[in-house]
Amino acid sequence: MRRRRRSSASSPPSLHSCTCAIELHYEVTRDAGRVRAAMVHNVVGTAMIFCSSAPLDLNLIHSIMPNSTFKKKKFAAVTIRLCDPNCTVLLFASGKMVLTGCRDFMTCILACHSVVDLLRQRLPGFYLEVVNIQMQNIVGHVDLHLCDEILDLDRFYRENNIECTFQRTMFPGLVYRAVDSPVVMLIFASGRVVVTGAKSTASVERAWDALHPKLLAYREPRK
């Protein structure tokens, strides 16, 4: 995160409605040993801007916002490209924002406030506020780097079928739902795992820490 301090003149407004989906990437040692620290790869967020004049005039916003594009006939939102933090924002007339390309959740928050600050500077007669920021879903990606091995998903399913759904003829991935966790994991024979359904990075890490040693027991030589 590049920015941690904000001047008192431009302190963040109160927060009230933002949702985010975060992608996490885990790096694993070559022998599929201990997982190194998780790294947030991409955040997709949605936020709501409250404005004293609603709906927002997108033509006006496009004319005053730098690095923005607006083609009403093709898409009903202004596209704003921020440099600091580096991300892309879609702003709709309803006040809804969709943010993509953020590196972490705090960057997503800063991007929301950056858009509002820019609008305040260029629309001095309007009251603007971002109104609750929370993570709604986290998507994690894990690659075990099995090299000359694969995961025996058929055996994994036979021995853990209470927690699994697996129909190889319809989809190559095994769906794993831990009994005591809301996290859902999609496991592929190649060693790639997609983790979703968590509300925090800690939940993702706990779920993966529980599954990781179990998965290693189902490695077999690649045929």
Role assignments for model-derived ranges:
Residues 1-184, 190-192, 198-223:
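Intrinsically disordered, low-complexity polar/charged tails and linkers
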